[in-house]
Swiss-Prot record:
Keyword hit for ATP-binding: no
Name of the protein described by the UniProt record: Conotoxin Pl071
Sequence positions bearing Tyrosine amide: Y69
Species this protein is from: Conus planorbis
Propeptide boundaries: 21-31
GO cellular component, one term: extracellular region
Top-level lineage group: Eukaryota
Leader sequence residues: 1-20
Tissue specificity note: Expressed by the venom duct.
Length: 71
């Protein structure tokens, strides 16, 4: 669930960023929200690269397959 939420959040941030760059290019007023630096730092350090978290996902996946939930 949290992975889906983060993917949707990335899509929204990318969409807002492209809207802002198009507005700057066309000379119209920029209407997107600025993304705070703290949010960007938190997002860049998102724990998908953390080996402990990856190991946790693998264990969870193995348990789901063993119990028949992953079919």
């Amino acid at each position: 669930m949290s992975r889906l939420f983060m993917i949707l959040l990335v899509i929204c941030v990318i969409t807002l960023g492209t809207d802002a760059s198009q507005a700057e290019d066309s000379g119209t007023e920029k209407r997107s929200w600025p993304v705070p630096d703290a949010f960007l730092k938190a997002f860049q350090s998102w724990p998908l690269t953390d080996p402990d978290l990856k190991a946790g996902f693998k264990v969870n996946s193995a348990q789901r397959v063993a119990h028949g939930y992953g079919k």
